[in-house]
Amino acid sequence: MKGRKDTPTLRVNTNEALTFTYKKKTFSGFKGDTVASALFAGGIRMFSRSLKYHRPRGLYSLDGECSNTCMDVNGIPNVNTEKTLLQNGMHVTAQNVKGSPELDALGFLDSLDRLMPAGFYYRTMHKPARVWPIALQQVRKAAGLGKISPDFRMSGNFDEIFPSTDVCVIGGGPSGMAAAVAAAETGLRVILLEARPWLGGFFDYRQSNFSQGVPHYQRAQELEARLRALPYIRVFAHSAMVGAYSNNLFTAFQIGGENDPFDVRYLEIRAQSTVVATG
């Protein structure tokens, strides 16, 4: 295990070790790690290969905003490991590679990039006509990243709720928390959605001073304490909004924690008004 640095904003509990498998080897991480951070700390730098040219891909956004670290986790393809919390006994597999991300047999496609510009399949392989059905099968095989096993059976506890509220705040950073507090203090019912497992936004990890010697992360903690003390606010952390519709209808999916009775929960929220505070 490499690269662990103790900081006031660290959310990894180094006293609780977890193990998982990758490339038929056992790796270790800690509670609070994501799958990607545990792999990186274990020395893994290459997580996948790009769709078309099979170019190497590694950590980029560190917040689940890219597909570089999409992997197969416990038989489920295209799992974004940058935002998937590590659990004991996970089985992680690379996808879109022939071999491994480090030694991909299809890596030679990168040297053929000039022969495969954008949309090349619309202009080539159509003459003679009998060639296209054969080429189409190969293009289909090359498309996509993960593969769904026909033998896979989904397991777990799934839930759905349909709450209504006066104000729906999307984003649990400093602006979102401040907006939720301001609305709740007037007596309005508030629902707060945050995609990360915790609140704070970009204040959460900043140790520089906010004002009067108070660091940003401490300011975020103070805002969260005020927010959670108010009875009219419902907080849905680890809940990514996936749809916004007319009449202030919002849908989201929430990932359950170890103390929740569900693994994944579908949220369908009706709101009178909305505050978008996504940064």
Describe these PLM feature segments.
Residues M1-G279:
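Residues forming the flavin
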